[in-house]
Amino acid sequence: CENTISGCSRADCLLTHRKQGCQKTCGLC
């Protein structure tokens, strides 16, 4: 998963997606 929304930390996106099975919680992943 990769964060695609400016202003959203990519590291936070990756951690969130690991926990939620790569659901779209931080933009298009």
From Swiss-Prot:
Keywords: Disulfide bond, Nematocyst, Secreted
Residue ranges annotated for the ShKT domain, each copy included: 1-29
A GO cellular component entry from the record: extracellular region
Keyword DNA damage recorded: no
Consequence the record notes for mutating residue 28 to Y: No gain of activity on Kv channels
Cystine crosslinks: 1-29, 8-22, 13-26
Source organism, top-level taxon: Eukaryota
Localization terms from the record: Secreted; Nematocyst
Function: This peptide is similar to the potassium channel toxin ShK, but does not show activity on potassium channels. It appears that Lys-19, which is expected to occupy the pore of the channel, is not sufficiently accessible for binding, and therefore that this peptide must have a distinct functional role that does not involve potassium channels. It is noteworthy that this peptide is much more stable in the presence of trypsin, chymotrypsin and pepsin than the toxin ShK.
Family per record: Belongs to the sea anemone type 1 potassium channel toxin family. Type 1a subfamily.
Any further remark recorded for this protein: Does not show activity against grass shrimp (Palaemonetes sp.) and brine shrimp (A.nauplii). Does not show activity on the voltage-gated potassium channels tested (rKv1.1/KCNA1, rKv1.2/KCNA2, hKv1.3/KCNA3, rKv1.4/KCNA4, rKv1.5/KCNA5, rKv1.6/KCNA6, Shaker IR/Sh, rKv4.2/KCND2, Kv11.1/KCNH2/ERG1, hKv10.1/KCNH1/EAG1).
Protein's name in the database: ShK homolog Ask132958
